[in-house]
Each structure stands twice: as structure tokens, then as C-alpha cells.
């Protein structure tokens, strides 16, 4: 694993893997001998443990993601498929706008590596120094586009360099990232494609059909490239580690400095595209650093950055945003982006509560805006496609929000009509509903509650379990591979149930995690899953 390297790595992370652990990680992540050339997801993670035969749920995702020997919880992306047949819209626009006179030949043909054309995929996403013409889709972007991107990359590099001068403790790590080639147009181009092809992993806040690296706020461009670089390094397709904790912290400061400036000017992301892009960048940084195995970074995100972003969203009214009838495509994109930024802020807050016992600052009750829309609507690449897909589907029926969903699933009554309404939620919706339940789990474990409260929550988890199989089965088989981290939601529900059942028991006294004390070392949660996660999941509450 190469992500998030730092000058003094041993002092920043839980511990460095020993020889045995390194060997185990190597065989787990790279069963295919020719991993640098192989892009077949079936050749990855072939040594994962088989599902238990006694009906218990395999918690391999939670164990892998929380394992402190990994530098990022996003290590699980190594097992994700890649949407190799797709090309981002800005690359298509570049190709369309590059015209050549009749009878002339594009000179880039003369520089092609013809051997690589025989492969389905480029040999190495990061091999730009040795073969800068082999990358994705054969053609590079037009010179004008490269020049614009190069100028933007240089601007970012210079800005962060100036910030590092005033932060001497961050300068060495930042210089290492520069020396390794992070701030190059070729790296940005390659990582943008890489992230685009794995955009399904997290439920995306980026609207890729209209995303343009030449025009988007440089703060957002930086956050996207940092996230894509983490993905790249989790697959070990990078010749060296581009990322250092110094680069991440400087980037985080840069993005939140701009956010504060806009808030001070009373700018609102509901009407300002630039501020919305800054909020997108903030969400990406919260997700990225919250997932990193860096204790201080995770503490900073949980205690400082997420609260700052939440305050901004509350002030702007983004948390309660809904779609309007007969929205134009442009209006839809902006409002749906607002909805997704609020949703992922809520999710990050929930995950900090689950993994770190960090008290959540948002409530499901205040989340009165729409749940994110279906991906087929979100990924419409034109106004015509949007209108065709959005008809009868954009204005949501009950339950349309986190607030309605969690109130309904916790309710005493669970009528046939309610069951039918909740049965229309798709797998992604249930992923969001799970995030709402995590706040109740935290409250149940850490506060004085009535004896009925744990039973109510167990009943809600059972209802969720009854909804998931049908929602999953409705997904076409070929599309299930694009479900991303949402496909692991049953594991979160299972460990939540186990935590509730342990409340007040003698066993609970042996678990550091169940003491409810905030800790930003994932080893504590990892040990809890190891110790209690594989217990029988029988004895569910009555619906």
C-alpha cells in the first residue's frame, strides 16, 4: 500500500505492517502475477474468506476497511470493477473540437504506441514519463486544453507552496509530493480518467457529464485528483506514492479557507455555482481524510471540518432542498448536487459515529430535503435524456427524505401500505437510510435511554433487513457490480444489531469500543468487529 505516505510514517499511523502482514496484504490485493497489466477485476481479491455456512453474514468489508495496517479505508476499491468502455464528457468534447483539414493526418498518430492499441486497457495509468501517448482512448487532449490544465496545475502548486512556507512542519512532505510528480498535467489527466471510471464506488457528488477540468473551481479539481490518486495507489498502480499527509492537510486548509471567505461574504451554494463546487471539494476532503488511517487527520475532520461544513449547509438551507416540478436540466443539476452534498455530509458524520464513536452533529429530523435521485437520472448526458428519464421519477413519493424514512422505519406501526411504500426504495436509498439509523445506534449505546429504545431500534434493523433482498434483486445482474460501497450496507446493519444486543452485558465491558469513548484509531472498531462481529445473528426482533 502506497497511499498517504509521510516523512515519518511510523509516528503518524497506528503501526507499520510487519513482514507477515505485508505478505498477507500482497497476496490479498494482487493474486494476479501480472497486476500491472491485468485489468480483470475477477483476478483481484481471490483470497477473500468464504461466506460462513451457518447463515451468518461475512463482515469482510468492515474488517478490511477498519484494519489499521491499511493506509486508507478505501483499500476495498481494489476489488471494484472499472468502467473501461466509458469516456468522460470533457474528453469527448476535446475530440469533437479538434478539427483537421481534409487530406491531413493528425500528427499524434505518428506518436502512438501501436503495441498498446492491441490491449483493452493501457498498461499502466501512471507511466506517463516513459510513454505519455499511450493513455486512455489513444488520443491525448488538444494542446490548448493541455495548456489550460497545465496552467491550473501550476497555480495550485504555487498556491500550496506559498501556504507551506508559513507552515514549516508541512513543507517537507509537500516538497516530496512535488518531487514525485503530483503537480503535473499528465498526472491530473490520468487520475481524472481513473476516478471517472470508478465513480460508482462512492455515491458521487460530481456531475460527470458536465464536469470540465478546465472550468471547474481549482479547489474542486484538486479534491477530485487527490481522491483519484488515493484510488490509484490503493490498486498499487502508482510507481511511487504521490500523497503525503502534508499535501492533504495543506489542500484541506486551502479548500476550507475559500469556504470561510465565501461564508463571510454571505454567499450561498444554493445560488452560487462556485460556492457549491467548494462545498463539493470539502465533502471529498472529509471523505478522503476521514477514510485515511491517520489519527490526527481523522480527528480534525470529525471535530472541525465536518461541523464547519454542516453550519454552512444549515445556513444556506441546503439540508431541506427538494426538486421542483418541471425543472430544466441545468436547474436539476445544481439542486441535485446540493442534495448530494448534504447527503454525503450526513453520511460522513454518521460514519464517524460508527467507526470512531464521534458524537454526530446532524440529525435525521433536520434532513427534510430529498434523498438523492436515481443514478440513471443523475448520469443523463443531455437535456433530452434527462427529460426522458426524469418524467414521473424526479418528484419522490413517501418516504422522500431521511426524516420521513427514519421516522417510518422506527414507527410502532408497520402497515402493509407502509411496507409497500418502503419496498419501492432502491439499494442506494437503503444505504442512506442506514446512515440515519447509525445516529440512533450511537444514542442507544452512549446515552441513558428507555428500555423500549433498543427494542425499537432492533425492530427497525429487522425491517431494513426485510427490504434489502428485494431491492437488491431488482437491480439488473450486470448493474450490481456498480453498486459500490452501498453493497456492504448489510454488514453495517449486522454489526449495529450486535452492538445493541451487547448493551449492558458483561461482554460489553471487555470491549474498548463499547465504552462509547471517541477514538480516531480504527484499531478499536476493528477489534470490536473481530471479537463480536461473527456471533450468530439469530433472534431478531418481531416486526
Question: Where in the sequence are the language-model features?
Answer:
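Specific register positions within alpha-helical solenoid repeats of the TPR/Sel1-like families, i.e.
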Residues: 229, 233, 290, 438, ...
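C-terminal substrate/ligand-recognition segments
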Residues: 483, 487-508
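Short functional micro-motifs and their immediate structural scaffolds
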Residues: 11-14, 25, 31, 110-111
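Structural signature of alpha-solenoid helical repeat junctions
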Residues: 216, 220, 277-280, 337, ...
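Cys2His2 zinc-finger metal-binding sites
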Residues: 3-6, 20, 26
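Cys/His-coordinated zinc-binding microdomains
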Residues: 7-10, 21, 33-36
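Intrinsically disordered, low-complexity activation-like regions
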Residues: 30-227, 250-268, 280-295, 299, ...
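Long amphipathic alpha-helical scaffold regions
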Residues: 243, 268-273, 277
